Regions:
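Bacterial N-terminal signal peptides that target proteins for export
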Residues: 1-11
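Alpha-helical transmembrane segments and their juxtamembrane interfaces
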Residues: 12-14, 66
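Core of compact, soluble alpha-helical bundle domains
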Residues: 24-146
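C-terminal segment of classical bacterial N-terminal signal peptides
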Residues: 15-24
Length: 146
C-alpha cells in the first residue's frame, strides 16, 4: 500500500529534478482510492479496523449486536466510493444508521483513533491518512448525538 512510483524505465530516463516534479504531479492526479491500493487494500484495512474496534472497550458496545459481515461490506463501499473508487454505498444514511445509539464525540474520536492504528499498521502515508479522515470526518455531525 505504499505510494507507487512510475515505471523504472521512465524513472531512469528522467533527471532527479524532473523525476521529483513528475512524481508529485502523478501523485496528485491519482485518486485517493488508487493511492490507498484499490479495493483489496481497502478490504484488508476494513478487516483490521473492525477487529480494532471490537477490541476497543471504549466503543465496542456500539457494535456488539452488529452484523459484522454486513458492517464490513458497507464500510468498504463507503470508503471505496468516498475515495474515488468504483463502489456505490448501499447502506443507510449515517443519521439513520446511528439513530438512538447515543454516540458521543469522544466515542467518534475513539473510532478515528482505531482507524489511525490500522492505517499506521498498513503503512498508509500520512497524507493519505489525512485525506481519508477528511472524507469520513464530515459524517461526525450525523453520527454524534450526545
Amino acid at each position: 500500500m505504499k505510494l507507487r512510483v512510475g515505471s523504472l524505465a521512465v524513472a531512469a530516463a528522467l533527471t532527479a529534478c524532473t523525476l521529483s516534479t513528475s512524481s508529485a504531479f502523478a501523485t496528485t492526479q491519482r485518486s485517493l482510492y488508487e493511492r490507498l491500493g484499490g479495493y483489496n487494500a481497502i478490504v484488508a484495512v476494513v478487516d483490521d479496523f473492525v477487529a480494532n474496534v471490537a477490541a476497543d472497550k471504549r466503543i465496542n458496545k456500539f457494535f456488539a449486536k452488529a452484523n459484522v459481515p454486513r458492517l464490513k461490506a458497507r464500510l468498504v463501499e463507503q470508503i471505496c466510493q468516498g475515495t474515488g473508487g468504483p463502489c456505490v454505498y448501499t447502506g443507510a444514511s449515517m443519521r439513520a444508521a446511528h439513530a438512538g445509539m447515543g454516540v458521543r464525540s469522544q466515542d467518534f474520536d475513539a473510532l478515528v483513533q482505531d482507524l489511525g492504528k490500522t492505517l499506521n499498521k498498513f503503512k498508509v502515508p500520512k497524507r493519505e491518512q489525512k485525506e481519508l479522515v477528511a472524507v469520513l470526518g464530515p459524517m461526525k455531525k450525523d453520527i454524534v448525538t450526545r
